[in-house]
């Protein structure tokens, strides 16, 4: 090792190189590289037709029927929970690095910002709700079977209306 290799400026230069390489790798991963890897998927979720930009869209993503059916309106059993900002009547999120498989989504437009699905005395939501596959609400939460969709390796997308 030469004296130049032991200098502080040489070590700083090497550290900058490592940092730049790590930054480039993380940027490539965030732009879809992970979705091209075997067994990895990206899911873009779009909520459309929102009647107000007030509040946020609260999202719970489930990867099993048991978690979905036992969650009620809480997101504690969810694989991923998100709070999305609303812009121009839409809200979107991209879930990177998820395993391919079956998923279902429950969401609601939290109009008053209390992070809870508000209901009337009979338990009927007073805030707009939506489910994957735009499964309709008929006096009960749609079942896993009605809401389940398959995420494949690579890029996937789903749109959900909140009513």
Description of each model-found segment:
Residues 3-19:
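Bacterial N-terminal signal peptides that target proteins for export
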Residues 82, 89-93, 145-147, 156-158:
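Short strand-edge motifs at loop-to-beta-strand transitions and within beta-strands
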Residues 14-30:
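Bacterial N-terminal signal peptides
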Residues 111-119:
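Acidic, glycine-anchored loop motifs typical of Ca2+
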Residues 101-107:
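A short tyrosine-centered beta-strand micro-motif
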Residues 58-62, 106:
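Beta-strand signatures of extracellular beta-sandwich domains
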């Amino acid at each position: 090792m030469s004296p130049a290799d032991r200098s502080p400026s040489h070590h700083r230069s090497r550290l900058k190189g490592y940092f730049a390489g790590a930054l480039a790798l993380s940027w490539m991963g965030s732009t879809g590289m992970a979705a091209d890897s075997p067994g990895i998927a990206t899911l873009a979720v779009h909520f459309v037709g929102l009647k107000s930009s007030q509040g946020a869209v609260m999202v719970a993503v489930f990867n099993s029927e048991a978690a979905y059916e036992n969650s009620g309106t809480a997101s504690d059993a969810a694989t991923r929970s998100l709070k999305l900002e609303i812009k121009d009547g839409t809200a979107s999120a991209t879930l990177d690095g998820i395993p391919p498989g079956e998923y279902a989504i429950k969401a609601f437009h939290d109009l008053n910002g209390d992070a809870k699905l508000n209901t009337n005395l009979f338990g009927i939501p007073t805030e707009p709700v939506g489910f994957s596959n735009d499964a309709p609400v008929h006096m009960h939460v749609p079942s896993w079977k009605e809401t389940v969709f398959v995420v494949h390796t690579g890029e996937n997308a789903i749109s959900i209306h909140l009513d």
